[in-house]
Amino acid sequence: VSWTKADIAFETIQQRQLVAKLMKSVKLFEGLSGDEALELLAQAEKSVFAAGDYIIQEGERGAFMYVIIAGKVEITKWVNGSYEKPLAEFGAGDSFGEMALVDNLERSASAKALTGCTLLRLSDQEFRLIPAIGAKIYRNIACLLSQRLRNTNAMISLLMAETDDAAA
């Protein structure tokens, strides 16, 4: 189901509240004006998943990402092809799948709905159609991926320290 401008126009208080809530809670939308958010949302596809559904699968190709409107999503990675290891849990306002949007390569991890989820699916096509919005979104994606890389580096440092302590 896709939203149309009529679905999310600033005509009702509820619709204005939705846009305002997204503007405040979704880091990906930081720096967008209300009109820009409305234009982006009009291009986005609304997706609904039941608990346990895979949203994206590690190894598949994708040129889109998701923003969580409601629900919880778990990010997992296969370890040695034998089991899935949880890496992160995301909730409303968070986004995932950005790497494939940026580089159009295979997904590096899977995402599974932990609860029923309502998501916005965004593709690079929306950002190309509206270059001014795309530039802001891609900058926000760069900041988000940078923060995640810093967190990953910190975790690797802790694991290396634990390994060094165990070997001593």
Regions found by a protein language model. Give the residues of each.
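Cytosolic regulatory regions built on CNB/CRP/Popeye-like sensor folds
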Residues: V1-A168
